[in-house]
């Protein structure tokens, strides 16, 4: 008889190798065929809503690791919520207006100047839709479950119509105004930028100290002094109209080399060192407030420079006397306005100086620095020129420096509802908690929001102008434009004349002849995406405002979190979200930013093609995503190894349940052995821990808990000793069915617990599980932790056993290394434990040699009675010797009962009995 045929070895068709790059697309096709998104919505209908609102990625190019991290995190949450009593719809979105699409078309050779704005915009829309399609397929490949057939797209007419309504509501409340004000201006984009569209990079700039002679000392100064200013933007000096000093600072009149200079007293030493003054003496001091209204002379124009008071003046750098050009700085503008100065801005849209800067007209601003510095030197006003490298704002799209420039722009007045904004921030739940401080400070400190852009591809600002120049924004015009956009899309604005965009028969006192103009500026793209709470959450039947959660990268505090908050509070008085969660950026394995120049870019598509979407998702679950995270081949290799461990666990569980019918073979909990009940206690602990981790969005805790459970609780302990029962005993042996009962509970729970993170794998496992009826694990709920009777006492006892078992394993390892035994089944062990452990061992009814995986187990005396040469550990001394007897051909246990049964002379007594009872006819 072939005894190996009498072993109940694991049997399953569940493949050992994941082969995810091939298997996942097939699984996704299956999901599409069964309409999994709709099925889940149907299954969860009537439950409380949980809305995670998708911040729209920009529709341009392939998705990058940041996109993957973001969408997968969202998917974890939505999947978990739909398995824990919520209906969790997920509507993906795309941001589709703005400069990058215009640039992409230009790069493709589109001749912008040779077509009408409307024609160019049609090409932009086509391109945007192509990009949406491209990204949609890549997001689907990640396994993200969403309403992919009904996303929201900011260029769609219904969306644009709602955005116009948001603008109209804000205008009605008096929050929208047109004003001349310095704004961030990008000469390369020829447009104003919002704060969210700038990034800081190092730039080399001229650093100059310039003397402004006093023209009128107002009886405070004698008139022969000179104010010293410091600037790193010499090109703004043609726009200088004043000097700001701080009212509370003390200013020194310093005599040196026959000249008298005015600087802040506390900066005297620094300035003296920089300007290499020797023997400089302070001849007089005055308070800043006394210098108000003194007048200096512009260094190279026949023009006054008024001395004004400003709280923005600091002693961090410079001289305490600040060059003030109201057309080129926010503080300058505010101070200038207070003192009635004009807003002089001698720079055009392209960054070129105009005739208002005589002597420098026609020069690009950055190229004007040198001739202006030379002019200062020529007139004797330049005291020092050096070059510094400093952090300077750049256009986030063109990567080129930007300037502050006063232009006529449309603004949303943040000041008008700042108090409500700050209250809304305080009422929101922020994860991480520092998010609250970050947004609070941004809202507290930000100026009014410049919402106009001088571009073609965007939503037009729905404003008309009367013949007398009055802007027209009324309920009637707003509603009419919104209706037109809903019917025809916003291109209609560029296809029709102003009169054809106004309601029929519209009149206005400022247009006696019935003539009207329309605004040509478009809205900031942050106003587009920032209106999604109205256009999506409020408009869709399956969603609601406020959303439960917004989840984006930490750059969105100044972006989407901010713009959404501003428009929502302006229109509804409340935040559009109850909670905000942010994640960090994805860096390479060494913690460097990914860039083409370094060549360290990791692409999601490559990972999915080589390893699979579930590996990428498992990586997302493994990292501390609230900070910046790292990814590399080595890191992915480690994650793939963890995946292999989890997959093998599933395969082992399935293999050993091949002959298990839950309805027939399940053993009642009360009839399980203690060790089996202990395993159920461990399983319930896992369920509790994992669900708590999901609830708090701590996915790394989910990852570690599941990995540890598979490797430590199952593989290293329970499954290890269970093999001797599962394979060796007869099919219906009570211990075997008891273990299978536990394995079944573990398998079902584990499959559900990993579903949000590994949906492809979980749905691959699901149909192999005996007795399941649901079409997909996604249509089930998370397992519930069951409180077993006496669970705490059981846990205490068996946790103690596990620590003692560690001592035994160490002793067996030593014996193996010393060649006393070959493998643990060759061993006979005698334990000399502590009193506490001895009592615990004596209370165990299970076969301890099975639990220790040895051939013979004896309990000796107390620890102090152990032989002198016996290795002593924390809880026991252990004597390991070679077991006496022969090795059983069937179970490999060393036993003196081999051959006792003449018919089965190579088997131990136990195996002979099993064979006779189950396999001998």
From Swiss-Prot:
<dbReference type="GO" id="GO:0005829">
    <property type="term" value="C:cytosol"/>
</dbReference>
<comment type="function">
    <text>Catalyzes the attachment of isoleucine to tRNA(Ile). As IleRS can inadvertently accommodate and process structurally similar amino acids such as valine, to avoid such errors it has two additional distinct tRNA(Ile)-dependent editing activities. One activity is designated as 'pretransfer' editing and involves the hydrolysis of activated Val-AMP. The other activity is designated 'posttransfer' editing and involves deacylation of mischarged Val-tRNA(Ile).</text>
</comment>
<dbReference type="GO" id="GO:0005524">
    <property type="term" value="F:ATP binding"/>
</dbReference>
<dbReference type="GO" id="GO:0006428">
    <property type="term" value="P:isoleucyl-tRNA aminoacylation"/>
</dbReference>
<feature type="binding site">
    <location>
        <position position="911"/>
    </location>
    <ligand>
        <name>Zn(2+)</name>
    </ligand>
</feature>
<keyword id="KW-0547">Nucleotide-binding</keyword>
<keyword id="KW-0648">Protein biosynthesis</keyword>
<dbReference type="InterPro" id="IPR009080">
    <property type="entry name" value="tRNAsynth_Ia_anticodon-bd"/>
</dbReference>
<dbReference type="Pfam" id="PF00133">
    <property type="entry name" value="tRNA-synt_1"/>
</dbReference>
<dbReference type="InterPro" id="IPR050081">
    <property type="entry name" value="Ile-tRNA_ligase"/>
</dbReference>
<dbReference type="Pfam" id="PF06827">
    <property type="entry name" value="zf-FPG_IleRS"/>
</dbReference>
<feature type="short sequence motif" description="'HIGH' region">
    <location>
        <begin position="57"/>
        <end position="67"/>
    </location>
</feature>
<comment type="similarity">
    <text>Belongs to the class-I aminoacyl-tRNA synthetase family. IleS type 1 subfamily.</text>
</comment>
<dbReference type="InterPro" id="IPR002300">
    <property type="entry name" value="aa-tRNA-synth_Ia"/>
</dbReference>
<dbReference type="InterPro" id="IPR001412">
    <property type="entry name" value="aa-tRNA-synth_I_CS"/>
</dbReference>
<keyword id="KW-0436">Ligase</keyword>
<dbReference type="InterPro" id="IPR010663">
    <property type="entry name" value="Znf_FPG/IleRS"/>
</dbReference>
<keyword id="KW-0067">ATP-binding</keyword>
<protein>
    <recommendedName>
        <fullName>Isoleucine--tRNA ligase</fullName>
        <ecNumber>6.1.1.5</ecNumber>
    </recommendedName>
</protein>
<keyword id="KW-0030">Aminoacyl-tRNA synthetase</keyword>
<feature type="binding site">
    <location>
        <position position="908"/>
    </location>
    <ligand>
        <name>Zn(2+)</name>
    </ligand>
</feature>
<dbReference type="InterPro" id="IPR014729">
    <property type="entry name" value="Rossmann-like_a/b/a_fold"/>
</dbReference>
<dbReference type="InterPro" id="IPR033708">
    <property type="entry name" value="Anticodon_Ile_BEm"/>
</dbReference>
<keyword id="KW-0479">Metal-binding</keyword>
<dbReference type="Pfam" id="PF08264">
    <property type="entry name" value="Anticodon_1"/>
</dbReference>
<dbReference type="GO" id="GO:0000049">
    <property type="term" value="F:tRNA binding"/>
</dbReference>
<dbReference type="GO" id="GO:0008270">
    <property type="term" value="F:zinc ion binding"/>
</dbReference>
<keyword id="KW-0862">Zinc</keyword>
<feature type="short sequence motif" description="'KMSKS' region">
    <location>
        <begin position="593"/>
        <end position="597"/>
    </location>
</feature>
<dbReference type="InterPro" id="IPR009008">
    <property type="entry name" value="Val/Leu/Ile-tRNA-synth_edit"/>
</dbReference>
<feature type="binding site">
    <location>
        <position position="888"/>
    </location>
    <ligand>
        <name>Zn(2+)</name>
    </ligand>
</feature>
<feature type="binding site">
    <location>
        <position position="596"/>
    </location>
    <ligand>
        <name>ATP</name>
    </ligand>
</feature>
<dbReference type="InterPro" id="IPR013155">
    <property type="entry name" value="M/V/L/I-tRNA-synth_anticd-bd"/>
</dbReference>
<dbReference type="GO" id="GO:0002161">
    <property type="term" value="F:aminoacyl-tRNA deacylase activity"/>
</dbReference>
<dbReference type="GO" id="GO:0004822">
    <property type="term" value="F:isoleucine-tRNA ligase activity"/>
</dbReference>
<keyword id="KW-0963">Cytoplasm</keyword>
<dbReference type="InterPro" id="IPR002301">
    <property type="entry name" value="Ile-tRNA-ligase"/>
</dbReference>
<feature type="binding site">
    <location>
        <position position="552"/>
    </location>
    <ligand>
        <name>L-isoleucyl-5'-AMP</name>
    </ligand>
</feature>
<feature type="binding site">
    <location>
        <position position="891"/>
    </location>
    <ligand>
        <name>Zn(2+)</name>
    </ligand>
</feature>
<dbReference type="InterPro" id="IPR023585">
    <property type="entry name" value="Ile-tRNA-ligase_type1"/>
</dbReference>
<comment type="subunit">
    <text>Monomer.</text>
</comment>
